[in-house]
Amino acid sequence: MTISGEVEEKLRKFIRESSFATAGGVVTDLDGTAVHEFQGRIAIPKEVELGLMRHYERGRPLMLNSLRFPLSVIRTFGQDWYKLSNAPIPTVTLNGSLMGFVKKSPEDELEFEEAAAFPLTESEIVAALDGVRGLLDGGIKNVLVFYYPRDWRIGEVIWTPVPENIDHVKEKYRSASAVTAVEFPKLQDQMLAEDICMIFLLVDAPEDQLMAYQHTARSNFVTHKGVDKLFGARVMADHLQCDLRDSLGAGDTELDNFLAGVGLALLVGNNQLNFRGLADTIKLNNSQELGALLFRAAELAAEKATHG
């Protein structure tokens, strides 16, 4: 697949006028952008693989930036991605709150090495759970609390207020390491006893039931104040000593706000996003087009590095 003339022109201009070839990198969201689910399996499209390989060959940083938790990244496509990188993978997880490197252990197993973490404060955890308490007091029991400890080995823990629902929740959310239905006060005590990087509140109830509790969104990601994907990208870019202003960024949802912090923003898919790159913005229809653009960007960067 080749890129269109208009995309080629924008890409050439960005690489010509920026320091992408020497100081930039690539930041990409995962689900819906660089990876897709196919027949129940998460896969990296071939075009994306080829584009990624060209960037890895050049040796410039390539950062993953995802809502997923580290254990999920490792379990779903970590092996496939590591075959492309053949080196530790810079990874921003949990909406910017936990970042580090997916790497091989001495036993040749994939593991996560933390570089930085920004867990919720006790007051932030209590505030999130106060919203849940309000729903429970109002008779709404279709509430799930997903929480993600800083210790990446724990993975994803889900709490339901209905013990009879544990098996159903386990079946529906197979990524969870544990599903619990402890009493609400004990849940709060457990969460306050450890570093929690992100909480996800999921409410499955009719709109009319929720009217009195508008402070609790139907679905709500909770991280430490000021922490999001853009924040995480900036912290990791500093760690990698690359400049986001000279980088490409690819995403597909409104949570991918790092797109507003990169030089060239690549908006993938059909969602109408308002993000604009600092230098320019390119709209792509799918991940196949993203792969073709990444491949071409690596070619142009290599040409600039060789010929100036």
Name each model-derived stretch.
Residues 46-162:
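Active-site phosphate-binding/coordination module
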Residues 37-38, 73-75, 102-103, 259, ...:
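Short glycine-/acidic-enriched loop or helix-start segments at secondary-structure transitions
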Residues 34-40, 217-221:
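Glycine-rich phosphate-binding "P-loop"
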Residues 1-30, 34-35, 46-57:
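Non-catalytic pre-domain segments flanking phosphatase-related domains
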Residues 33, 40, 70, 255:
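Conserved Rossmann-like nucleotide-cofactor binding loop
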Residues 6-18, 183-186, 292, 297:
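A short, compositionally biased domain-edge/stem linker segment
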Residues 135, 140-248, 254-262:
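Conserved acidic, metal-coordinating active-site core of Asp-based
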Residues 2-4, 21, 25, 45, ...:
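Mg2+-dependent phosphoryl-transfer enzymes with acidic/Ser/Thr/Gly-rich catalytic loops
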